[in-house]
Amino acid sequence: MRLSGESINYVLDLQKKKLPRVYCCSNIERLNDLSRGIIYYNGKVKSKLDESDDEIKQMSTLLIFLDEIRDENIMDIEKNLMSISKKQVVLLDTKGIDLIVNKRNLAFSLINRYNINVIKGTKEEINTLIALQTKEETTNFSYRGFAKRNSCVLIIKGEKYYITDGYSEFYIKNKNEDFPDEDFLDNIYTGIIASSIGICNNKSEIVQSLLISTLAFYIAQENSIGLMKKQFDDSDYENNIKLINEYLLEEISKMDVQEIRAYGDIEYYFKR
């Protein structure tokens, strides 16, 4: 499957025009990386949100990390979830749910009570989340079934990125094995997709933006690795973490329609 040049161009142009504002419920260390992913993909960052109507209306995406929800901030997060409109998008990162037992019921509660548009995690994390609802389905069917039941889009990070809205299934390559700083890489990707979905008004637009931003991220990885290989042996990668990270961000900022369309290899399946 290949995305059309018109759809890619429309999404990238709208991204630059709107500059979606992402509110990150994150610690300072993670926020530093997230901010770079968001800004380099034409978004704006907000780490503190006043309770004024204007502040809430200006927010495009609410980004929540499950492993950062604490007793002292859960009330503020829930207030934000209750205040946002249907035009605003919520992204939940399930990082740590498979390891932190007391976070599982919290995640389940948030999904049941609020409109969570996009849920991201590893296969282990998403499987843990799905197991809270049902244990009867086969793996791929449970991913689609979970997305359909909860009216959300799932992103599963593995050897390939798996994206489903409950009906369509998409697979896009992942190239993170060449990057020594995996946490930085994951935070950048999360920032990119948080920015990308901030322009969306419905689920189909969310899927389209996720496909484009995930492709852009993969291509940026390939390009930055290519630049490194021209200068260093593979053994020197770990000694140049900052440089490869900077190359990645530069390639993200330069991404255009032609480059995404020229690649465009997406595995696609549809089931009712």
Language model segments and positions:
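General beta-strand structural signal in soluble alpha/beta enzymes
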Residues: C24, V45-K48, V90-T94, V118-K123, ...
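Short, small-residue alpha-helix embedded
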Residues: T128, D181-Y218
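Charged C-terminal helix
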Residues: R2, Y218-R272
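Active-site cofactor/substrate anionic-group-binding motifs, chiefly glycine-
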Residues: E29-K86
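Conserved phosphate-donor
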Residues: N140-D181, E222-I225
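Short, well-structured alpha-helical segments that form the helix of a local strand-helix-strand
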Residues: T139-A147, S204-E222, N245-L249
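Conserved beta-alpha-beta core of the PfkB/ribokinase-like small-molecule kinase fold
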Residues: T61-L63, I69-F141
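Glycine-rich phosphate/adenosyl-contacting loop at the front of the ribokinase-like
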Residues: M1-I39
